[in-house]
A protein has these predicted regions:
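A generic structural signal for ordered alpha-helices
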Residues: 1, 10, 18, 22, ...
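Transmembrane-embedded, aromatic-rich helix segments that form part
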Residues: 12-15, 35, 114-115
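Membrane-embedded alpha-helical hairpins and interfacial helices in multi-pass inner-membrane proteins
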Residues: 28-33, 47, 54-129
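Transmembrane helix irregularities
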Residues: 4-6, 24, 107
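Generic transmembrane alpha-helix motif of multi-pass integral membrane proteins
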Residues: 1-11, 43-48
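Interfacial aromatic-anchored transmembrane helix boundaries in multi-pass membrane proteins
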Residues: 16-51
Length: 129
């Protein structure tokens, strides 16, 4: 939502969120992939055209949210492999083992993604006051 409205400036709330998550949950090894997984979502969103039609946005935003949830384990896996000494096969096994959770993550993100367009409209309206 912030990336669609604020573009590059959205990195500020992203990393404030990452910092708060670390403060709340502890700056342990699980936190390290947070430093880049959210930036990947930001980058994908930045690649979308600015003037995207609402009819397209209503489908694209939930799909991107769902894909990010589905691929979260894949995005997380390289850091886990490096931190825990997994070889490529071990990393793939870790991804496959987490896939049921990624499916749940994708489903939740897909549903939440339908809120993106209405919330973007509200935020843009508030910005132009």
């Amino acid at each position: 939502i912030y990336t669609i409205v604020y573009r590059k400036k959205a990195l500020y709330p992203i990393y404030i969120f990452v910092l708060i998550t670390g403060l709340y949950g502890g700056f342990a090894l699980w936190w390290i992939p947070y430093l880049y997984t959210w930036t990947i979502l930001w980058g994908i969103t930045m690649l979308l055209p600015k003037g995207i039609k609402d009819s397209h946005a209503a489908m694209i935003y939930p799909l991107i949210c769902g894909l990010h949830g589905l691929l979260y384990g894949v995005l997380y896996a390289p850091a886990q492999a490096l931190m825990f000494g997994l070889d490529f096969d071990g990393m793939i096994t870790w991804i496959v083992a987490g896939f049921p959770f990624d499916l749940l993550h994708a489903g939740g993100n897909l549903v939440a993604g339908f809120l993106v367009l209405p919330l973007v409209k509200v935020l843009k309206k508030l910005e132009h006051r």
